[in-house]
Design a protein with these regions (language model features):
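Bacterial N-terminal signal peptides
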Residues: 7-21
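Exported/periplasmic ABC-transporter solute-binding proteins
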Residues: 26-63, 67-74, 79-105, 111-259
Length: 259
C-alpha cells in the first residue's frame, strides 16, 4: 500500500474512533542540528497521528551530528545545514535524490531580558556593542558554520578574549543561551531559532545585511535507512508550504526564501 493510500486508511480509522497502528508503522530516527529543534517538535505529533509512524529526535550541534553519522551511528532522517548534507552525500551517507532544501535562518544579537538593547543596525554599531561588552558568547566555531562566521568577524575586528572581555564559545543548546539569561554574559550571537523561545533572553536585532550569514537547512534520507519511504514522507511533511508559519514563528524565514 502506498503512502497516500495509507494516509486515507489512517484518516478513516481515526474518524471511526479506531486505534491507528499500521502494519508498516516504524520509529523514525531523526538527527538534527539544534536550530530547528522547536520547529520540528510542532508538526511531529500530527505526523505521528496521520501516518502511525513514531518520531524519535536527536538534537545536537551540527558538527557532532556529522561525526556520529560518519562513525556509523544509524538514523533515518538528517536535518542539517546544506553544506554538511553535501559532505555526507559525498561520503555516500545520503540516499540519492532524497535531499530537500527546507528554509534558512539568520544570526541574531541577544542580551538578557530586561537589559538595554544595543543598536545593531549597522556593522559599525555591532562592532561598537561588542567592543563595549564585558563578555561575549557565540556558537562553537569548531562545530557550526554560524560559529565560524562570528569567530571570523571577531578576529577581523581584533576583538579577542582578554581579562577585560571574556569570549565564551558555547552552543546555544548546550548552555550558551542560559549564560545570557542568567546574566553571566552580556551579549550573544546565535541563530535566531536557537534563542527566540529561550526564557530570559531578548533579541536586540538581526545582524545587518553586510554582516549576516544565513544558514540554509536541508533534509535528507540516510542511505542505510531501513524505512526510506516513511523517512521521505517526514521530510515532505515538515517542508510542506502549510507549515511555513510554524517555521517563521520559531525564527526561520519562509520556505521559499531558502530556494
Amino acid at each position: 500500500m502506498g503512502i497516500p493510500s495509507m494516509r486515507i486508511l489512517v484518516a478513516a480509522l481515526t474518524l471511526l474512533g479506531l486505534s491507528v497502528t499500521p502494519l508498516s508503522a516504524t520509529e523514525l530516527r531523526v538527527y538534527s542540528g539544534g536550530a530547528p529543534q522547536e520547529t520540528l517538535k510542532l508538526p511531529a505529533p500530527e505526523f505521528e497521528k496521520t501516518t502511525g509512524h513514531r518520531v524519535a529526535f536527536t538534537f545536537a550541534v551540527v558538527g557532532a551530528i556529522r561525526q556520529r553519522l560518519e562513525a556509523g551511528e544509524k538514523a533515518d532522517v538528517v536535518l542539517l545545514p546544506a553544506p554538511l548534507i553535501d559532505a555526507l552525500e559525498q561520503a555516500g551517507k545520503i540516499r540519492p535524490g532524497s535531499r530537500s532544501r527546507l528554509t534558512r535562518v539568520g544570526i541574531a544579537v541577544v542580551v538578557r531580558a530586561g537589559a538595554p538593547k544595543p543598536d545593531v543596525s549597522t556593522p559599525e554599531a555591532v562592532r561598537a556593542a561588542l567592543m563595549q561588552a564585558r563578555s561575549i558568547t557565540h556558537a562553537d566555531p569548531q562545530a557550526t558554520p554560524g560559529g565560524r562566521h562570528i569567530a571570523g568577524l571577531l578576529k577581523q575586528w581584533d576583538i579577542t578574549d582578554t581579562p577585560q572581555r571574556r569570549i565564551t564559545p558555547k552552543s546555544a543548546i548546550s548552555g550558551g543561551a542560559e549564560l545570557i539569561a542568567n546574566g553571566e554574559v552580556d551579549i550573544g550571537l546565535y541563530l535566531l531559532s536557537e534563542v527566540l523561545t529561550v526564557k530570559g533572553v531578548a533579541v536586540a536585532g538581526m545582524l545587518p545585511p553586510a554582516l549576516q550569514n544565513y544558514i540554509v537547512y536541508a533534509g535528507a534520507v540516510l542511505a542505510d535507512s531501513p524505512a526510506p519511504e516513511p523517512a521521505a514522507e517526514f521530510i515532505r511533511f515538515v517542508a510542506d508550504p502549510s507549515r511555513e508559519q510554524q517555521w517563521k514563528t520559531t525564527g526561520f524565514e519562509s520556505i521559499s526564501q531558502a530556494k
